[in-house]
Structures are given as structure tokens and as C-alpha cells.
């Protein structure tokens, strides 16, 4: 399963750099995620990168883009010129900053090698080539660095100078999923939650009233422990019903 031909486990993202977006604080450094009516299950983000410049983008699972037959650039323009028009009225798009790409997600598959086969004769795959992008946040740098560290631990430049044995590749694959599997699986669950408009609205309303739930939602972007709690059926039932 080296190639995901149907693109079931891919997201697409479109990014621009804007200067002077209203309500953005360089010092605070807050990352904003917005789930906007009319473009769900996609999400819109804004975060500062310094000197009054913001990274502004839009992301959506590739399968959902195909279903809706939409372009991410058009969806982002719809959000900026509609719901966020006031915040962008004095902002300036930085020329040449528009870029789109596909993200190979680390969501679990029904295969023996998860998330996808990451080894072959004489090689190990790391980062995006191993499909390690977080399905919920779209972040991939941390997992790429971790996979590189794991790959190095299985390779000896003297012993393996004529090529990496398949058995070592298999061990690397198992260690990779043992290390990242739970986190990626929980992120996949969170990604699926955002496909249900009523659940997103209900969850956000409850989070506005409950500090603990609001904290978990914020920490889920960076904390494995918070993601585990947030995908617990009992915790969700307790917070969302009572």
C-alpha cells in the first residue's frame, strides 16, 4: 500500500500571506481555526508569522473537495470577502505568496502496514513520504522529524552499507506506528467530528460555557493527552449532555 491512488487519505490546503489583517496580535501568536457556514467540512485559519504578516489559509479533505467540485482558492475568497470582510478591509495580499498543495494524512488504514508502507528494499520512508501529516491539524513537521530520528536508529552505515535489510524495514514500520498510531488515530476521529455541522455547533456552544472543555479543545492542537480525552465517548457525553 505504497500509493493511495483514490486519495482517500489526503487533504488539500491553500495558503496566502497577508499584511495588516485586523485582530491579529504578533506578540500573542494565537492560531485561529474557523469553521464557517457554507464551506464545511473545510476550515479557515489565520496565524501571525511576524512583522504584521499573517499566514492565511483554507483546508479540506480531498475526498470532500471532489464531492463538492470546489476550488480551495475560491472557498478562501468566499470566506475573506464574506464573514471576514471587516478584518481584511485594510489588509494587503503579499504578491507571489499563494500556494496550494496536497497533504498525505496519517489516518489509519485496514492494512498490515499503517498508515502506509514506509519501507522497501534498501530504503525507509519518513515525513510526508510515509504519510504522517496529522489528520486534524494538518501539521507534519514534528512527525517528520520524529520519523527521521526513528529511521536513523534502525540504520547502521557500516553494517547496512550494501542496503537496508527488509527485516529492519519491518521493525521500523512497527516502531513508527507504535509511536504515532494512537495520536494519529485520535486526530482522525477529531477530523471526522468536524464533518458533522450540528456536532461542531453544539460542541463550540458548550465550549464557550465550559472552561475545561474549552481548554481541551485548545490543547488538542498540540497535546496527545488532550486529543485522547477529547475523543473519549464518556467525556464527550458528560460535557455535552450535562
State the predicted function of each range:
Residues 46, 118-121, 164:
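A generic short alpha-helical patch detector that favors 3-5-residue windows
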Residues 23, 38, 54, 108, ...:
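Short capping/connector residues at structural and topological boundaries
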Residues 31-38, 60-63, 81-83, 91-96, ...:
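A general structural signal for short secondary-structure boundary/capping elements
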Residues 12, 16, 31, 37, ...:
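Flexible, active-site-adjacent loop/turn segments at secondary-structure boundaries
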Amino acid at each position: 500500500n505504497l500509493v493511495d491512488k483514490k486519495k482517500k487519505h489526503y487533504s488539500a490546503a491553500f495558503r496566502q500571506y497577508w499584511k495588516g489583517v485586523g485582530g491579529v496580535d504578533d506578540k500573542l501568536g494565537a492560531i485561529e481555526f474557523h469553521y464557517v457556514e457554507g464551506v464545511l467540512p473545510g476550515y479557515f485559519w489565520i496565524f501571525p508569522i511576524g512583522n504584521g504578516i499573517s499566514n492565511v489559509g483554507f483546508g479540506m479533505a480531498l475526498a470532500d473537495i471532489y464531492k463538492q467540485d470546489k476550488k480551495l482558492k475560491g472557498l478562501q475568497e468566499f470566506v475573506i470577502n464574506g464573514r471576514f470582510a471587516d478584518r481584511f478591509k485594510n489588509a494587503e495580499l503579499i504578491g507571489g505568496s499563494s500556494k496550494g498543495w496536497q497533504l498525505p494524512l496519517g489516518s489509519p488504514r485496514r492494512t498490515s502496514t499503517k498508515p502506509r508502507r514506509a519501507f522497501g528494499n534498501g530504503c525507509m520512508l519518513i515525513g510526508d513520504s510515509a504519510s504522517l501529516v496529522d489528520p486534524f491539524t494538518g501539521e507534519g513537521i514534528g512527525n517528520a522529524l520524529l520519523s527521521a530520528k526513528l529511521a536513523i536508529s534502525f540504520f547502521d552505515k557500516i553494517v547496512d552499507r550494501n542496503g537496508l535489510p527488509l527485516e529492519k524495514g519491518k521493525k521500523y514500520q512497527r516502531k513508527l506506528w507504535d509511536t504515532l498510531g494512537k495520536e494519529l488515530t485520535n486526530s482522525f476521529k477529531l477530523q471526522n467530528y468536524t464533518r458533522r455541522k450540528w456536532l461542531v455547533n453544539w460542541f463550540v456552544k458548550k465550549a464557550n460555557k465550559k472552561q475545561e472543555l474549552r481548554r481541551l479543545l485548545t490543547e488538542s492542537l498540540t497535546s496527545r493527552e488532550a486529543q485522547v480525552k477529547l475523543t473519549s465517548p464518556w467525556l464527550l457525553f458528560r460535557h455535552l449532555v450535562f
